[in-house]
Amino acid sequence: FRLPRQADNTALHQETDPALKRLVVVASMLALLLGPNVSRAQSLPSIEDTVAVAEPLSGYFNLYWNNLTGQMFWEIDSLNTEFLYQVSMASGLGSNPVGIDRGQLSGTYVLSAKRVGPRLLLMQPNYRFRASSTNELERQAVQDSFAPSVLWGFDIVAETEGRVLVDASDFFLRDARDVTGTIANRGQGHFTLDVNRSAFYLDNTKAFPENVEIETLLTFTSSDPGTLVYGVAANGNSITLRQHHSLVKLPDDNFKIRLADPRIGTNGPTIQDYSTAIDEDLQIRLVARHRLEKKDPNAARSEPVEPIVYYVDSGTPEPIKSALIEGASWWNQAFDAAGFINAFQVKELPPGADAQDIRYNMIHWTHRRTRGYSYGGSVQDPRTGEIIKGNVNLGSLRLRQDYLHGQGLQPGFDYLSSAGGNNDASVNMALDRVRQLSAHEVGHTLGYPHNYLASSYGRESVMDYPAPLIEITEEEQLDFSNAYLQRIGEYDKLAVRYSYEQFPPGTDEGEELAKIVQESLDRGLLFMAHNNNNFVGAGHQYASVWDNGDNLVDQLKTEIEVRRIGLANFNPTLIREGEPYSELEYVLLPLYMHHRFQLNSAAQSLG
């Protein structure tokens, strides 16, 4: 194959039919005349025309629900502006080992919408690595060294005066929580999302001035579901869960970051700052904290501009609900020590409020088939450590385990009966534990990790793992009245002071924070978190779990004696009338193993 010579091309051109030449001229003229109309036909329609039959939800972002097509349109009016995106679970599977719970937080993302031609990309910057330098090129070098992410891409379907509209149905109706991966990792089958049995849950899809809340109903199917799934789902081959999405306006730039100190336990973002001096630590550890400011910055004690308010799940039964409110409210004692008056409040979630709404700090009462962990976490601004939402999940079956513990130790213990008569001490022990647990998990949402040393200096932190302190009377009876300390700890007050104390204008904050740290050392209010201290043979003598006492071996002797008295009193009256004797086994187990954690701790203290 060869190309014709130029002479041949010329000859061909010269021999072209005159009629064909006229046709080419006419076609060219038509193209010029129709060109603008063709361009207009290819331009995007207006947003108003596209959503003419849709129901608007106006807020921080505008959404449009088309009830005829089942589409959810998302209008973005500020391109390249960062916002917060949070995923959570509005309903749960009900299996503790699988770990998909009602009210559970999932991914937190800072995103911005970037337009590239006909596409809109949700960009996630990488805030874990940065440079605080004033040199723009230095900052850009760090930014280009660590990969950002594109969370999603959309086709733009309409636009009006710089505002763009996308069909966000697939984005919201996806498995954002990775339910399928979680179930598979637990060995409970291979599930897939069935889009034909999934839809928007419009009752909890709402728009507000600074946040938009979208909820979806997702159905997952499998031909090989595991026994844990079968044990809790209505149909193990098909499980339906509600997933929640929050699109939130990020806080303004007026929040002041505070640097962490390892001697006071705080959680928060850790950032690698490549502009630090060569003789300084590359890692910058921020304190996670709510935005809390005094009305009067010059006053030693002042009411806050806005208090921190936590809400208890309105589906919690009494007397547990009141116990949760009371225990969480202990933290107000710590904020009072930091100079704030009535800065921390706990209330019941008001009627009509959505627990998944990002504006509510929540304490959820979560049911599962079996007993499991309670936990507390928070939604944080990764740029500053500012806490945007605190979120607690308390497993309801924990209380029943505490009931079994007390039931074995004291004849006549009856958790399900009303408090009164001979059962007062036993019922109060269980509720005391609920108060302590509420304070403990709320502490995690406030940014505080476990402090396993506190049991060695008078139980002065609710952030320890507490064993019930059962005391023996002179009559060799068991006294439950001091089983769980019913107040905030002195260490907790220092931790809140470090995180939140507001110093008068002109004060050197670094010097004042150093004084708080030194006070904790001088008073012996020390901190030690996980750091491999959860097992026999761990490094620290006293940083152990579920123990009591400053001498762990001596306290072990006491726990063995408590166990002996409990076993001596063990009899069939420990179970309810009409129950089979086989139920005694469930009561006996926690009694028989009463000393087990103290034994572990004593062994650890000996090395």
Name these PLM-found stretches:
Residues 3, 12-25:
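Bacterial N-terminal signal peptides that target proteins for export
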Residues 25-35:
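Bacterial N-terminal signal peptides
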Residues 37-41:
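Sec/Tat signal peptide C-region and signal peptidase I cleavage site
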Residues 42-316, 348-401, 406-425, 434:
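Auxiliary tRNA-acceptor-end handling modules of aminoacyl-tRNA synthetases
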Residues 63, 348-367, 432-487:
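The catalytic-center signature of Zn2+-dependent metalloproteases
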Residues 81, 317-343:
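Zn2+-dependent metallopeptidase catalytic core
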Residues 329-340, 443-444, 448, 468, ...:
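Sec-exported extracytoplasmic/periplasmic mature domains
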Residues 455-607:
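Conserved catalytic/binding loops enriched for acidic/polar residues
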